[in-house]
Design a protein with these regions (language model features):
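Extended beta-strand-rich architecture
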Residues: 1-195
């Protein structure tokens, strides 16, 4: 489904010896396939716009075959779709996760086989990659019979555990009124939004 290359870390899944059924024979290394299926199922049932999320665990083996327990990572996967949804709507939702924890994420251009090449970014926190966001490729949307564009994000919550429950500090309100201005900039296409 994701079109991952053979050496992709997401392909290094742990196979269960006695699964409930063949569809559940691998421990998840990403929540993306289930989110893609959930979005497709909703669209097939007539829900042409929506937002869903899942908080679940993914299991990253240190070595295969297993010699020690895998790294279990609590992860949130967010999916949105519809005429009014776009990359920046999803980025706003991811920023809301950061604001809730009183932290800032950084976004850097990225490439993933299942996401649109120019509408994809990796999410960094303190310089460490903790997730990604982007639009599903047209090929996946067509393969899953999606009628509306879909976007997904995946964030490693385990990497954010150190900031859970920290009390923020606040600055006093300024005595001077805030002024906002509308500003348009003209620059080269090679300049990224982070610069």
């Amino acid at each position: 489904l994701l079109g991952l290359p053979e050496d992709a870390p997401e392909r290094k899944a742990i196979r269960l010896i006695n699964p409930i059924n063949e569809d559940l024979s691998l421990m998840r290394t990403t929540l993306a396939p289930q989110m893609i299926h959930a979005i497709a199922r909703n669209q097939k049932n007539g829900c042409l716009e929506g937002r869903v999320y899942e908080i679940g665990n993914k299991f990253i083996p240190k070595d295969l075959p297993l010699t020690e327990y895998p790294d279990e990572r609590e992860t949130i996967c967010i999916g949105i779709w519809g005429k009014e949804e776009n990359f920046f709507t999803l980025k706003g939702l991811v920023d809301t996760v950061a604001e809730t924890l009183f932290i800032d994420f950084e976004y850097v251009e990225d490439k993933k086989t299942f996401l649109h090449p120019y509408r994809t970014a990796k999410i960094l926190y303190n310089g460490e990659e903790i997730g990604y966001l982007g639009q599903l490729t047209y090929e996946i949307q067509k393969e899953e019979d999606m009628r509306e564009s879909a976007y997904i994000a995946e964030i490693d919550l385990k990497a954010l555990r150190p900031v859970y429950g920290k009390v923020p500090t606040f600055a006093p309100i300024s005595r001077f009124a805030k002024e906002t201005r509308d500003l348009a900039l003209v620059m080269s296409k090679s300049v990224t939004c982070g610069e």
